[in-house]
Regions:
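C-terminal alpha-helical cap of glycosyltransferases
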Residues: 354-370
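Internal alpha/beta domain cores that form substrate/cofactor-binding pockets in large enzymes
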Residues: 38-94, 99-132, 136-141, 159
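A short, well-ordered alpha-helix in the C-terminal region of glycosyltransferases
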Residues: 336-350
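Hydrophobic alpha-helical packing elements
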Residues: 323, 340, 357-361
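Nucleotide-sugar donor-binding catalytic core of glycosyltransferases
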Residues: 1-60, 68-71, 142, 146-287, ...
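Acidic, glycine-centered active-site loop in nucleotide-sugar glycosyltransferases
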Residues: 305-313, 318-319, 325-326
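Acidic-and-aromatic substrate-binding clefts and catalytic sites of carbohydrate-active enzymes
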Residues: 101-108, 131-133, 254, 277-281, ...
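Conserved acidic donor-binding segment of nucleotide-sugar-dependent glycosyltransferases
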Residues: 283, 314-320, 329-334
Length: 370
């Protein structure tokens, strides 16, 4: 069996990773250099599927213009086109049985894809966005997501959808240093947007006032007139607009991949707050932070225990005051904080590794293929 997977990264991260490519490196070497940063899913599907001899796998990072040019240079019979054409050319060349379109680049042509390429037996996609519109995503055989509310929306429009929790790639631990004693206190790594992260904004602002928090917020800038300030004004969120000034002044920037894992591993605790519309926990940070053994402070949801035992493998809170109280307690009891993080790590490595994530994916694919 052969599988091709299409993925994409944000423009900012993709641009930074492009710097890894020089004139001397070809397509395969370029892939190796970019995936070595372990950003998002990287090439972890290929790693596990081929290690377990389940199927030959081709990973395609659509957002890398440098990789695209190198691929076409190695395939002179193909004329370089846009992102969709690039994906179609990759399919024509690789001839996969299974197409996992995580980037959803094939959506405009998904209805006719099997007619165009009769060797394709299964198409799948991923939806992790709470505000997505499944009624506009028809055509794939399988749909995967991370939380029940997204699954419910897909099932309601007739999609065959499955929850597949995120997984932690255990080999990351071979590329970072996890200190025996963590002296840094509390960190937050992520984004901050009006209309989506109002609770997150309040929590971070309160912890900032407590002088215990360091933050890396990837979607805010620095200065008087920034995109983030204009965004808050557009939403009429004047409290967030006011709060942005100190956030931007002391913001440490965007973190991704190995650098993100290494940073979280140096802290006793990290804040993990879901979007305002999310009813259940299920984001990537659960496995990322848990995988490096950092004690997580998570906004409580009804399915919390499906991931972590409260107060044993993670610390959950319902109100900002409760969070502040628990942060003070954990700072006064560093050994207990450390043990919670290590217990979470054991749970992640046992139940939520990336190998387990890939195994769940393939179980659904094989079930569809019969």
């Amino acid at each position: 069996m052969k599988l091709i997977k299409f993925s994409s990264l944000s423009g900012q991260i993709a641009g930074i990773l492009e710097q890894e490519l020089d004139t001397a490196c070809d397509y395969r070497e370029g892939q190796r250099r970019i995936y070595a940063h372990a950003v998002d899913f990287a090439d972890f599907y290929k790693k596990h599927l081929e290690a377990e001899q389940q199927c030959e796998t081709e990973e395609v990072l659509l957002s890398s213009a440098g990789l695209r040019k190198r691929w076409y240079a190695a395939h002179p019979s193909c004329k370089e086109g846009d992102t969709l054409q690039y994906a179609l050319d990759q399919i024509a060349e690789f001839k996969p049985d299974v197409v996992f379109d995580q980037a959803r680049v094939l959506l405009p042509v998904i209805g006719d894809l099997k007619k165009k390429f009769p060797f394709i037996r299964c198409t799948a996609t991923w939806d992790g966005w709470i505000a997505s519109e499944p009624a506009r995503m028809h055509g794939y055989d399988l749909y995967f997501t991370c939380v029940p509310e997204i699954l419910e929306k897909h099932v309601a429009v007739g999609h065959r959808c499955t929850i597949n929790p995120f997984g932690f790639e255990t080999s990351i631990l071979n590329h970072i240093q996890v200190p025996e004693s963590r002296t840094n206190r509390v960190c937050f790594v992520g984004s901050l947007s009006s209309g989506i992260h109002n609770l997150r904004n309040r929590v971070l602002n309160e912890l900032r006032k407590e002088d215990v928090l360091d933050w890396w917020i990837g979607n805010i800038g620095q200065g008087l007139f920034t995109r983030s300030k204009l965004r808050e004004l557009a939403y009429g969120n004047f409290r967030a607009f006011r709060n942005n000034f100190p956030f931007e002044r002391d913001n440490r920037g965007k973190l991704y991949g190995l650098e993100m894992y290494q940073t979280m591993a140096r802290y006793q605790m990290t804040i993990n707050i879901h979007g305002d519309q999310v009813r259940n926990i299920g984001n990537m940070r659960l496995t990322e932070a848990g995988g490096v053994g950092t004690c997580q402070l998570i906004d409580w949801k009804p399915n919390a225990a499906e991931y972590f035992k409260p107060d044993e493998e993670a610390v959950f809170f319902r109100t900002v005051d409760e969070l502040k109280s628990k942060v003070r307690y954990l700072l006064d009891h560093p050994e207990e904080t450390r043990n919670i993080g290590l217990a979470a790590q054991k749970r992640i490595l046992r139940e939520f590794s990336f190998a387990a994530h890939v195994s769940r994916f393939m179980k659904e694919v094989k079930g569809f293929l019969g």
